[in-house]
Curated annotation (Swiss-Prot):
Gene Ontology MF terms in the entry: GTP binding; GTPase activity; metal ion binding
Binding partners and assembly: Homodimer. Heterotetramer of two MnmE and two MnmG subunits.
Sites where the protein binds Mg(2+): 230, 251
Localization per Swiss-Prot or TrEMBL: Cytoplasm
InterPro entries from the UniProt entry: G_TrmE, GTP-bd, GTP-bd_TrmE_N, GTPase_MnmE, MnmE_dom2, MnmE_helical, P-loop_NTPase, Small_GTP-bd
GO biological process: tRNA methylation; tRNA wobble uridine modification
Record-linked PANTHER family: TRNA MODIFICATION GTPASE GTPBP3, TRNA MODIFICATION GTPASE GTPBP3, MITOCHONDRIAL
Lineage: Bacteria, Pseudomonadati, Pseudomonadota, Gammaproteobacteria, Enterobacterales
Listed name of the protein: tRNA modification GTPase MnmE
Entry keyword annotation includes Hydrolase: yes
Residue sites binding GTP per the record: 226-231, 245-251, 270-273, 335-338, 358-360
Function: Exhibits a very high intrinsic GTPase hydrolysis rate. Involved in the addition of a carboxymethylaminomethyl (cmnm) group at the wobble position (U34) of certain tRNAs, forming tRNA-cmnm(5)s(2)U34.
Length: 454
């Protein structure tokens, strides 16, 4: 198998459909056109032609599109054959094409990989193709399209360019220490470094939102038995996803629901009531509940309002609060307001959001939905946003760490070489996002997750 091979793959999903598309890319795409179509179509025009077998019989007829390189998606010669979407017809046509020497089935993501290698896309844009296909909401699709059009890459490239200028300035200070210009006392290096750090912090914040939009925020409902956790899951899901009874401990295992609030994806997780386990099955359920809590982006601390008037979570259940991971956001949900007569709505107590509602009647649940949406940071128009992956967040975090270490060098003993090295490492981390600096292993992992025809 060679990267110089001409590749072919079905670009439409398997199964029956009105249209089925085969995509060919590489040096022999021209030969495929002349062999199967009997002619080379006019570039970038839709040509209605018969698709012929080796003996001249017609296998199908449809639209042929010819994109000579480098003006194509992959940067190579590309031919697309759009015929009828029956699996038998497409299979016959594919077999016909593969009889031509030098052609093979494409690997998953190989078309996008070739586009990246031929500088048609950077790595973040290539990943955005897969994210656009996998988008589970309108907002995710819009943000993926923004990434595909270069919104994320432009922000990263701006940071890389700023670091390039800063490195030039720092290395000049190192290489010409006896010059009359004092590169340190004029404050330019510190000012430029602070500007880069501020810009990077802004990109990190937006990338975290983009990651939540892509992967969804994990919200765990936790509390004592019979507090109404399963009722709240059902209210948020809009269906009877969990069994609800008056018997404490009905929920023994983790229940998951994937929902959207105004296009924002959330993974809502109902857990077993937390208490001293009465049997082995309940003990396992409680252990799993804590595992989910430790991995959560937010915890809804469910409180039965008929059992306590307290609103401060540390007063309601100090042992529970003490065991929670540090910095894990908590929303206190006082349930059964239809019984207690409490005023519905949201307030704040000791830095925690407090929401009074009735999971059984649904009163106040909309307030919780809006709160969850706002806690993701998407309470404003996000049309200019972009999607981000975990590897992007990791690269941004590492770059931020190197810049902070570099700033410490600048404000400390002025170890110029060490500052220059921290700037270089930060620049390298950022370049990994767009693929300017990356490994073959990383490329393989990224593109192998794509569809075959992409």
């Amino acid at each position: 198998m060679s990267d110089n091979d001409t590749i072919v793959a079905q670009a439409t999903p398997p199964g029956r459909g009105g249209v089925g598309i085969l995509r060919i890319s590489g040096l022999k795409a021209r030969e495929v056109a002349e062999t199967v179509l009997g002619k080379l179509p006019k570039p970038r025009y839709a040509d209605y032609l018969p698709f012929k077998d080796a003996d001249g019989s017609v296998l199908d007829q449809g639209i042929a599109l010819w994109f000579p390189g480098p003006n194509s998606f992959t940067g190579e010669d590309v031919l697309e054959l759009q015929g009828h979407g029956g699996p038998v017809i497409l299979d016959l046509l594919l077999k016909r094409i593969l009889t031509i020497p030098g052609l093979r089935i494409a690997r998953p993501g190989e078309f996008s990989e070739r586009a990246f290698l031929n500088d048609k896309l950077d790595l973040a844009q290539a990943e955005a193709i897969a994210d656009l296909i996998d988008a589970s909401s309108e907002q995710a699709a819009r943000s993926a399209l923004n990434s595909l059009q270069g919104a994320f890459s432009a922000r990263v490239n701006h940071l890389v360019e700023a670091l390039t200028h800063l490195r030039i300035y720092v290395e000049a200070a190192i290489d010409f220490p006896d010059e009359e210009i004092d590169f340190l006392s004029d404050g330019k290096i510190e000012a430029q470094l602070n500007n880069v750090i501020a810009d990077l912090d802004a990109v990190r914040a937006e990338a975290r939102q983009g990651s939540l939009l892509r992967e969804g925020m994990k919200v765990v409902i936790a509390g004592r038995p019979n507090a109404g956790k399963s009722s709240l899951l059902n209210a948020l899901a809009g269906r009877e996803a969990a069994i609800v009874t008056d018997i404490a401990g009905t929920t023994r295992d983790v229940l998951r629901e994937h929902i959207h609030i105004d296009g924002m994806p959330l993974h809502i997780i109902d857990t077993a009531g937390l208490r001293e386990a009465s049997d082995e099955v309940e003990r396992i359920g409680i252990e799993r509940a804590w595992q989910e809590i430790e991995q959560a982006d937010r915890v809804l601390f469910m409180v039965d309002g008929t059992t306590t008037d307290a609103v401060d979570p540390a007063e309601i259940w100090p042992e529970f609060i003490a065991r929670l991971p540090a910095k894990l956001p908590i929303t206190v949900v006082r349930n059964k307001a239809d019984i207690t007569g409490e005023t519905l709505g949201m307030s704040e107590v000791n830095g925690h959001a407090l929401i009074r509602l009735s999971a059984r009647t649904g009163e106040g649940v909309d307030v919780l939905r809006n709160h969850l949406k706002q806690s993701m940071g998407f309470d404003t128009n996000m049309e200019g946003g972009f999607l981000a992956r975990r590897r992007h967040l990791q690269a941004l975090e590492q770059a931020a760490e190197h810049l902070q270490q570099g700033k410490a060098q600048l404000l400390g003993a002025w170890a110029g070489e060490l500052l220059a090295e921290e700037l270089r490492l930060a620049q390298q981390n950022l370049s990994e996002i767009t693929g300017e600096f990356t490994s073959d292993d990383l490329l393989g992992r990224i593109f192998s997750s794509f569809c075959i025809g992409k």
